[in-house]
């Protein structure tokens, strides 16, 4: 049986207190973390070199020693934030797989996870993921970095789904890689409705996603 606190565990996993991954150089790490913090309050195109230097206390020479320009730094910060999203997704699903003992419990857990990731509270996170992906499409430099993080997420989901399939918690008739991509697609796809003048009723959308989970992931 799923623990009573499983829903709150999901919320904690998707909080914003996850530590930033460290790079090999402390100054570079500090600059990236500073830029990542600024992205909490400002748009990509609003952040300047001066804002980063004022906040970090690091010299301009050090910044340009590690980064070609401000965009190089901000791309690194966006990748770090994306990596944090990857880590929280993996943690939440690992927690579910550890807790669920039956297919029905796995279904309930996926439904709860879906409600969190597609709720109003994650709207900004969805927008940021879309912005990061969009930036990577036009920046070969960033694309290489994002490919690694995206592959890490997909690979982790594939393995988690395979584990669930081996325990008969999840439909074993569908390719685990295809299921992993679908799981990501329905969450990120909500960004389309986030930008709508007349958004869909979220309960209706979640009911539809739950039906997909029931009929595709965990059929009775």
Model-based region annotation:
Residues 119-144:
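Amphipathic alpha-helical segments used for helix-helix packing
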């Amino acid at each position: 049986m799923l623990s009573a606190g499983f829903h709150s565990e999901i919320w904690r996993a998707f909080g914003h207190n996850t530590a930033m991954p460290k790079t090999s150089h402390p100054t570079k790490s500090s600059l990236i973390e500073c830029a990542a913090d600024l992205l909490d309050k400002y748009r990509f195109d609003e952040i300047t070199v001066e804002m980063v230097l004022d906040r970090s206390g690091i010299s301009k020479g050090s910044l340009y020693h590690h980064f070609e320009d401000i965009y190089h730094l901000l791309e690194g910060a966006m990748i770090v934030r994306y990596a944090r999203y990857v880590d929280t997704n993996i943690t939440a699903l690992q927690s579910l797989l550890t807790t669920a003992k039956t297919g029905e419990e796995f279904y309930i857990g996926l439904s709860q996870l879906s409600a969190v990731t597609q709720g109003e509270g994650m709207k900004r996170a969805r927008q940021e993921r879309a912005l990061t992906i969009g930036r990577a499409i036009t920046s070969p430099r960033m694309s290489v970095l994002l490919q690694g993080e995206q592959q890490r997420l997909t690979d982790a989901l594939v393995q988690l789904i395979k584990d669930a399939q081996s325990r008969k918690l999840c439909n074993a008739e569908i390719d685990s890689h295809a299921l992993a991509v679908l799981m990501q697609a329905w969450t990120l796809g909500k960004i389309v409705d986030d930008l709508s003048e007349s958004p869909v009723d979220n309960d209706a959308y979640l009911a539809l996603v739950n039906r997909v989970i029931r009929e595709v992931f965990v059929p009775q």
